[in-house]
Amino acid sequence: MQLILKHTQMCHYRTAGYTGAASEQFEILLFAYSLNDEPTRIIDLASGEKISDKIMEYLTDDSVIKTAYNAAFERNCINRFFGLSLKPEGWRCTLVQASMLSLPLSLEGVGETLNLDKKKMSEGKDLIRYFCMPCKPTKANGGRTRNLPSDAPEKWELFKTYCIRDVDVEKQIRNKLTKFPIPDREQELYCMDQRINDRGIMVDQELIGHAVACDLLYKETVTKK
């Protein structure tokens, strides 16, 4: 069984991965998925919709293979938002697969290179800035610091379409690359890499503190010159 995933998050979007998910502002707004190549569905979490118990069961079942472009990002954000501890063994990353074939690293770039029928929507960047990043309070927007679905219903519907399209693109990429599977040994290394990132590493905090101080001192000296 295959589950293709894509989510859209709210946080300071200049951060990503572990740092972004650790933000107090972090939340998942939209959750799009396709089960066994069925039509893509979307769950509007920001508007109060809920993920079904069955899908949550699939997420936590390592025998159900979850696929995503940059699966580490999806897995980490899902873990953070739902309080889960999803293991990398249940995931496959089409970004890793594409990289092994020297394809571009972006979803958009892979779509263009493979000449997919459906490609990533160019409107996505503006929609992400609008809904996923804090906004400047003004008189025109009523002093709000965040744009909600109710503030721009038409944009929100387009945002949902964008999220669905990303899953459709990811499905096409997965299907195009089925003849070039990630070797078992490489998948083992990927899982090891993910476990290390999940756990983190021990560092000498005193050394790090001095390194930061040296960097600041150097920048101050160069600036004065």
Outline where the language-model segments fall.
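Active-site-proximal helix-loop-helix substrate-binding element of RNase H-like nuclease domains
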Residues: 26-33, 37-178, 185-190
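An acidic- and aromatic-residue-enriched active-site/binding cleft used to recognize and process polar
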Residues: 6, 71-72, 208
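Entry/capping segment at the start of metal-dependent catalytic domains
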Residues: 1-27
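Extended, well-ordered alpha-helical scaffold/bundle regions in very large, multi-domain proteins
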Residues: 184-225
